Amino acid sequence: MTEYTFDDLAVVMGTYNEEQAIGSVLADIDRITDGRAEVVCVDGSDDRTPEIARKMGARVIEQEPQGYGVAVEAAVLAPDRPVVVTTDCDDTYPMEYLPKFLDLINDGYDVVSGDRITKGAETMPRLNRAGNIAFARLASFLMGATVHDTTTGMRAYRRELLHDIEWTENTGLSAELLIRPAMRGYNIAEVPIPYRERAGETKLDPFAGGAAIGKSIVKVCLEERLRL
């Protein structure tokens, strides 16, 4: 089995008006990977986010704002490198876990998913935390297998998996990116990670967004059940 290094790693994200945080996120990726990882940002911003990202060496794909999932799907399918890590651009996720995620891919896992809930996620707004716990319980019930965090933005994937599955969701894409591989028998590892307070304002309405995510979880789980 091929032993992947940071030269085989792409870190991707959808970005939208994150000029307060993007520099810190990209600096962390560069520091942790010694500048060897490719960074891809699919961007729909009207602030300085794409300018900052380009100056820091990221590949920026500009896109009209069409929602979280449209941007992230474009981001995960863009790299040619064999290991793709998703993250958010709001500085909430610990880039120091990139080596551990890569090690687990090298151990044979197809998806490595950062679990924010197990460590407590005290910096997460209370309503968001309650919703994320509820989403994980709903998905676990419908899948017939326990998952702890279906909506985390930090995961590592084998590239071929991302191209072998057809993705259909927008707001609920993060949950779909875990549920479909899990229900198709891919090897999944969940890794408890710390979660930092976000830099800048959230763009997601917790009620409308939460309803869309819940609907996606039910839809995707039922579709995967019907495939079996």
UniProtKB/Swiss-Prot annotation:
GO MF annotation terms: glycosyltransferase activity
Q: SUPFAM superfamilies given for it?
A: Nucleotide-diphospho-sugar transferases
Q: Which UniProt keywords apply?
A: Glycosyltransferase, Transferase
The answer to keyword Transferase applying to this record is yes
Q: After gene disruption, what is the outcome? A: Cells do not generate the small monosaccharide-charged dolichol phosphate species.
What is the name attached to this protein's record? Dolichyl-phosphate hexose transferase HVO_1613
For this protein, what is the EC number? 2.4.1.-
Which family does the UniProt entry place this protein in? Answer: Belongs to the glycosyltransferase 2 family.
Entry superkingdom: Archaea
Uppermost EC category: transferase
Lineage of source species: Archaea, Methanobacteriati, Methanobacteriota, Stenosarchaea group, Halobacteria
What's its job? Glycosyltransferase that adds a monosaccharide to dolichol phosphate, thereby being responsible for generating one of the three monosaccharide-modified dolichol phosphates. The subunit onto which additional sugars are added is not known.
